[in-house]
């Protein structure tokens, strides 16, 4: 018997701990869908409500590739996660709220003329933090997986590597910075 723990709204709705006889991690959701009334419909409709799920085997968060592995006695935990949530941007949002609070406090001091500056700065920093939390950037070239994945200097830039999905900079005047190559091709021509 494998122990399956449900977290968050799943645990509140369907019970926190379940025991099922399963051989692979991927069978946990199927076993609960067949034996717990309403579980399958809840899982199907959860994406519309802005939820996705993380599966933990023991303390390790596993991916889709690891779901087919056999159960080795570890506890399987299924935890709901809000779609689009991540850790980046939380500190920025808190810093923005602090700046707005500083602006409110400055209203009652001799430096009241500076309070609109703190309101605007705090609101901009908060908005930037919220946008950063809701729209994650693609990993792309930030995650260097091999030693061959290095910056290229072939087209005259400082570093002209860019990942898919990033904006293309528009520059007027002389270029002294790295650039993003939109399209390039190299072909070999026989020389005789």
Curated annotation (Swiss-Prot):
Compartments where located: Host cytoplasm
GO biological process annotation, one example: viral tail assembly
Give UniProt keywords alphabetically.
Host cytoplasm, Late protein, Viral release from host cell, Viral tail assembly
Name a single GO cellular component. host cell cytoplasm
Task: Please state the span of the N-terminal signal peptide per the UniProt entry.
Answer: none
Q: Which family does it belong to?
A: Belongs to the lambda-like tail tip protein I family.
What this chain does, per the entry, is described as:
Plays a role in tail tip complex assembly. The tail tip complex is assembled successively with three tail tip proteins J, one tail tip protein I, one tail tip protein L and one tail tip protein K. The tail tip complex interacts with tail measure protein to initiate tail tube assembly. The formation of the tail tip complex is completed by the addition of tail tip protein M, which is followed by tail tube polymerization. May be excluded form tail tip during maturation and would be absent from virions.
Q: What's this protein's name?
A: Tail tip assembly protein I
């Amino acid at each position: 018997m494998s122990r399956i723990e449900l977290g968050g709204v799943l645990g509140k709705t369907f019970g926190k701990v379940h025991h099922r006889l399963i051989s692979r991690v991927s069978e946990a959701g199927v076993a609960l869908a067949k034996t717990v009334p309403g579980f399958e419909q809840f899982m199907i409709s959860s994406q519309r409500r802005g939820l996705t799920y993380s599966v933990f085997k023991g303390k390790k968060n596993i991916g889709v590739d690891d779901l087919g592995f056999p159960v080795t006695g570890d506890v399987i935990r299924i935890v709901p996660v809000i779609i689009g949530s991540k850790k980046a941007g939380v500190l920025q949002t808190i810093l923005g709220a602090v700046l707005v609070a500083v602006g409110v406090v400055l209203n009652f001091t001799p430096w009241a003329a500076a309070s609109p500056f703190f309101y605007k700065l705090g609101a901009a920093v908060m908005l930037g933090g919220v946008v950063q939390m809701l729209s994650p950037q693609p990993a792309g070239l930030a995650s260097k997986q091999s030693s061959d994945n290095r910056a290229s200097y072939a087209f005259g830039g400082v570093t002209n590597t860019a990942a898919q999905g990033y904006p293309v900079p528009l520059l007027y005047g002389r270029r002294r910075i790295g650039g993003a190559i939109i399209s390039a091709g190299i072909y070999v021509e026989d020389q005789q």
